């Protein structure tokens, strides 16, 4: 794991939509994560971690 990915994982824990935006840009993934984070923080965080770790 390089330092950029470590920083993205930390961002995914505290600000999930920002981490998804940095990993994939503004798209469907970012909108889904934003909605998950607004309604339920924990699923939004898990989804962001999944996106960051698989990209």
Curated annotation (Swiss-Prot):
InterPro entries, A to Z: PMP3
One Pfam family cited in the UniProt record for this chain: Pmp3
Domain of life, per lineage: Eukaryota
Coiled coil: none
Signal peptide: none
Function: Plays a role in the regulation of membrane potential. Could mediate a proton leak.
This protein's name: Plasma membrane proteolipid 3
